[in-house]
Amino acid sequence: MNRPICLWMTSRSRSSLVSKIFANHGVWWGDTLKKSRGYDTYENQVIKKIQKDIIKPKSGTLPYLEELDLTEETQQRFHQSLKQHIEDTMAKNCEKWSMKTGVEYFNAWRGLNPYNIFIKREASAIAKSISEKRIGDYESAFHAANWRFEYMNRIQKEHGGVFINTDDIINGNYQGIREAMEYCGIDYNERAVESAITR
């Protein structure tokens, strides 16, 4: 199984846009279309279910503001299930594959040495979006977004990776995308970026 590209996200960060940009660059993401609040999520629904079935937090349900503490047995079972799904489903000529998921799941993926792509947006904008969509309240969403971004910073410091600010993409600044593609060993294509954006 090739090294995964993990698109680490928090809610309402425009992570589906980033996943679509990677898909437009030829990265396999599962081709399991699902709409959420009117947009395509570009999230592998099969892997999402595998992950949800195997990976559990110590308390509550994910997404949850804690670093996962997993047994070696759980990690091995998760990795074996991923490998089986990838081998059974992904085209043999496809070299790169991605998974878009909450950064809380990092410890489940860490042993696979993923390319770490951290998707960021202003925490206040995320909280406002969550509040306006009536998904949750502003204060809780703001706190959760900041916790996740701090966790992303710690992961990057220890394991490497690239941040992509989706506000920059919307405003026409693709530098973060360029750096992410270079980091993942993918040839950058600006047309693939532009075609993913709906303005």
Give residue ranges: language-model regions:
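Short, well-ordered loop/turn elements at secondary-structure boundaries
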Residues: M1-N2, R12, K92-C94, G111-N113
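PAPS-dependent sulfotransferase catalytic core
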Residues: M1-S81, R199
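Proline- and acidic/polar-enriched loop/turn elements at helix boundaries
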Residues: L33-K35, T166, A192-V193
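Glycine-rich phosphate-binding loop used to anchor ATP phosphates in small-molecule kinases
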Residues: T74-G111
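PAPS-dependent sulfotransferase catalytic domain
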Residues: K96-N189
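C-terminal accessory extensions appended to soluble enzyme cores
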Residues: E190-R199
